[in-house]
Swiss-Prot record:
One Gene Ontology MF term: transcription coactivator activity
Bias-annotated ranges (Low complexity): 42-61, 248-258, 270-283
Protein name: Transcription cofactor vestigial-like protein 2
Gene that specifies this protein: Vgll2
Pfam families reported in the protein's UniProt record: Vg_Tdu
Amino acid sequence: MSCLDVMYQVYGPPQPYFAAAYTPYHQKLAYYSKMQEAQECASPGSSASGSSSFSNPTPASVKEEEGSPEKERPPEAEYINSRCVLFTYFQGDISSVVDEHFSRALSHPSSYTPSCTSSKAHRSSGPWRAEGTFPMSQRSFPASFWNSAYQAPVPAPLGSPLAAAHSELPFATDPYSPATLHGHLHQGAADWHHAHPHHAHPHHPYALGGALGAQASAYPRPAVHEVYAPHFDPRYGPLLMPAATGRPGRLAPASAPAPGSPPCELAAKGEPAGSAWAAPGGPFVSPTGDVAQSLGLSVDSGKRRRECSLPSAPPALYPTLG
């Protein structure tokens, strides 16, 4: 019994492709095994006749193997594990053949031309070109986009004929100029603009009453820099209230008291401290217009009243125990 017969008896029948590959070798091994069994089982008397009868096929098979040694050479078997045996049918050096194959394949120039390049060239040569194929120099960018030191021209007044002729342009000035980009942030507040909601104006976005009626429709809508201008005005603080340095210029100078008058003359007249601020002709319409200023006045008037209520007589002497 041969090694192949033992292996396939243990691990079951071979696969179809293995069976097709090993069929001639199985037949040859079975033929030689039958010959050996027949020679051993033959009697000594008939050994001569048996040897003469079996002498003819043996030389024929030997000649056949000598005539085609490469075709009939069995594959090389390599044991990998208990369930895998590798058979190699290739004859020769595998590494040299692989190197020769790849060197031959790499030596030939590539004749592959992708269809995407041809279609792209055809599309670019046509009358319609894609937007991405235009270079940056052919696009309609203003001069300040290419030159950072470009100075934007001064816009003409609204009443001039030059401004009327170019009024249909989308931009009155260059949108990329530094003066245009930073002009809105540093522009001061208008004279008519106030941060308080009770100062209604047609241009104010929060104006009430008639500002939202026919009068507002006659004026253009306020720009962004007009709405947010008080944020960047140095006269206003972080809470949109005028700073302390800007108030004395708006208020009327107070009259200096007489030398002989007491310091509480304002409170002695019976006139409240906040009435001068809330008067119709005063600088503010109501005390709520400026919360910080009214609080400061109330604190000052309280201090003056306390000073007037204190007795001016000398302190009383405490009685001493005799």
